[in-house]
Amino acid sequence: MTKVVQFSLLLALILVLSVSLASAASQNLEFTELEDEDQSNLSTYIVHVRKPQVIQSDDLHTFYYSLLPESTKTTNQRIVFTYRNVVNGFAVKLTPEEAKALQQNEEVVSARPEKILSLHTTHTPSFLGLQQGLGLWKGSNSGKGVIIGILDTGISPFHPSFSDEGMPSPPAKWNGICEFTGKRTCNNKIIGARNFVKTKNLTLPFDDVGHGTHTASTAAGRPVQGANVYGNANGTAVGMAPDAHIAMYKVCGLVGCSESAILAGMDTAVDDGVDVLSLSLGGPSGPFFEDPIALGAFGAIQKGIFVSCSAANSGPAYSSLSNEAPWILTVGASSIDRTIMATAKLGNGKEYVGQSVFQPKDFAPSLLPLVYAGANGNNNFSVFCAPESLNRSDVEGKVVLCEDGGFVPRVFKGKAVKDAGGAAMILMNSVLEDFNPIADVHVLPAVHISYEAGLALKEYINSTSTPTATILFEGTVIGNLLAPQVTSFSSRGPSKASPGILKPDIIGPGLNILAAWPVSLDNSTTPPFNIISGTSMSCPHLSGIAALLKNSHPDWSPAAIKSAIMTTASQVNLGGTPILDQRLVPADVFATGAGHVNPVKANDPGLVYDIEPNDYIPYLCGLNYTDREVGVILQQRVRCSEVNHIAEAELNYPSFSILLGNTTQLYTRTVANVGPANSTYTAEIGVPVGVGMSLSPAQLTFTEVGQKLTYSVSFIPFSEDRDNHTFAQGSLKWVSGKYSVRSPISFIFL
């Protein structure tokens, strides 16, 4: 495989486009390819129905088929999937006219065209305080016996990260199957693998993208010594829960992830008996009753399954989140303290530090002519080094300064420079990305630098008639005290779907993460790994950590595990100062949520905020959803007129999001003691300007494990002190000895 093809494989994953995707069959899920009729006017619709009364699971397909218009029954069967666990309904190929006719059936709640959603480590375990044979890894048996279900692009089963040496057989509850054939496929590590995006050329759940292999090994990869990419980030690659089992559900391909396949994967995973679901994918914000991941996740938590999802890569814009439902752990991305360092050195002696994975040893450090790509390009896209935008006469043999953005993938910019004869590339961040360069596997000598450094390079180019530069490659450096830092791409809150719930919930490692890859990037014979970035990478870190907690505390609910993760999170970096964002200023709660995950502390949180599935009913009715819309989520008939509605902030969540106008708001929370039997917690509050807070009681005294106590907190507006600010943030901590149970608070001023 050529280097260009390899890089295309990588970028097709990261910048996946939203276009149509084929569906696939599964056990207990019906699938028919429509080969004998014109499909040009057919689209896949997701159909939600009222919960059938007293009907056997095996009869569901027949029941759903009976609802279809007669015009669909004259040719091949149109039903793509039938769902049994996470939603009441099915996916079907219809014309717009047939969909309209179907919606006239009183058993049908809704029928809408499906959307296509997009895909959103040698060092991270030690960065997070996980050590072999010690602490949480020892106490949780490294996740032994826990099953992590991963919905992604498939998996490469031959990779040593998925060796089952020394692993036990799957637990007796496991009900899944393996669709791989031949030898060395599923084993006691990969215990299940299904494909829901079958095509004529690819029917098995092999990973033809790379994303699924990377996320699976991040969550639960086995130790592999000598892991590296081009000699960088060398060490032992291991996942968060190395002894957990993996079940892969292939729901995505090169072009994205169809809603019908996602629902089919989640439906099957629940039936199979997974303990944790990990989804590094998502779509735009929308109401929960139209969100396939929110729907599937609610069905999962009803069965005690923890669900972790990526927050999306649309930052740093506010309200850019995916996967906002309160029953999902929404994970943003942060940096780690490892840098794959490269330096841009200018002819005036100044140096600007950046990052690059590709660090050729044969690149001479001598100065070369430096040119700005936007100076004499072929079109307006030359500044972004778009393909065929550069003149060979301008860039041949030179170092080319390119700008990030312009809808041109970073590695493709380097290819454009190389194709035009350029010797090297210096890539400067956009103003939004600022101080947040990313290490990429470039196709030529390159370095990614900050926006500020890029401005300095532009100024230098304009100051002399003979600007020169070179790139110094300095390898892997550990110990950046600014880590963790919120990445520029990590999506921010507040939530659009539910502004009264603070999102994201947590941040975790998502920048320059090394993990398993299906193919070698440098044609070496060593096991292939790759370094990529995204909230897709942070999500499986948290999924693996949840698996550790599930083993350590098998009686904890999904909400209790989430609470433990959130209330023990860190708000400071390795240097002991507040976590920063891409601008090198303190990150706000809409970027960090509760803070950066601390797995060791999460294993012993002291107190937890628990939520039962039925507790969400008054919350959902409080969102002013109709009875039918709430029923789609709950998979049961609901009459909100008979339910006590609650405000979003009244949900027993481990954080607060307060939409504060001119009146005082009072909310209650209940905490359960999971620490020492006899313990007293004292409240500490951090109150921002423009708000007053009062708490009752100010102390909580427990006498037994499992005991629950309730407190109330009032938020009082002081509008004259706000200085025209639109939001503020504070915190509430319950402190007892070594325990500090912290809830972040966001205030949105109305």
Swiss-Prot record:
Q: Which Pfam families match?
A: fn3_6, Inhibitor_I9, PA, Peptidase_S8
Q: Which UniProt keywords apply?
A: Apoplast, Glycoprotein, Hydrolase, Protease, Secreted, Serine protease, Signal
The principal location of this protein is secreted
User: Where in the sequence does glycosylation occur per the annotation?
Assistant: N41, N201, N234, N380, N391, N462, N523, N624, N662, N678, N724
Q: What Enzyme Commission number does this protein have?
A: 3.4.21.-
Which terms in the Gene Ontology molecular function aspect does this entry carry? serine-type endopeptidase activity
The residue ranges of the PA domain are 369-457
Q: InterPro entries recorded for this chain? A: PA_dom_sf (IPR046450), PA_domain (IPR003137), Peptidase_S8/S53_dom (IPR000209), Peptidase_S8/S53_dom_sf (IPR036852), Peptidase_S8_Asp-AS (IPR023827), Peptidase_S8_subtilisin-rel (IPR015500), Peptidases_S8_3 (IPR034197), S8pro/Inhibitor_I9 (IPR010259)
Which residues are named in the active-site annotation? D152, H211, S536
Q: Where is the signal peptide?
A: 1-24
Residue ranges constituting the Peptidase S8 domain according to the UniProt record: 127-603
**Could you name the Gene Ontology cellular component terms for this entry?**
apoplast; extracellular space
Where found, per UniProt? Secreted, Extracellular space, Apoplast
GO biological process terms, semicolon-separated: arbuscular mycorrhizal association; proteolysis; response to symbiotic fungus
| Induction / repression | Rapidly induced in roots during development of arbuscular mycorrhiza (AM) upon colonization by AM fungus (e.g. Glomeromycota intraradices).
Knocked-out gene: effects: Decreased fungal colonization and impaired arbuscular mycorrhiza (AM) development during AM symbiosis with AM fungi (e.g. Glomeromycota intraradices).
Domain (Inhibitor I9) spans 44-120
Indicate the family of this protein. Answer: Belongs to the peptidase S8 family.
* PANTHER family the UniProt entry points to: PROPROTEIN CONVERTASE SUBTILISIN/KEXIN
Q: What does this protein do?
A: Required for arbuscular mycorrhiza (AM) development during AM symbiosis with AM fungi (e.g. Glomeromycota intraradices).
Q: From the Swiss-Prot or TrEMBL record, give the protein name.
A: Subtilisin-like protease 3
Q: What is the organism of origin for this protein?
A: Lotus japonicus
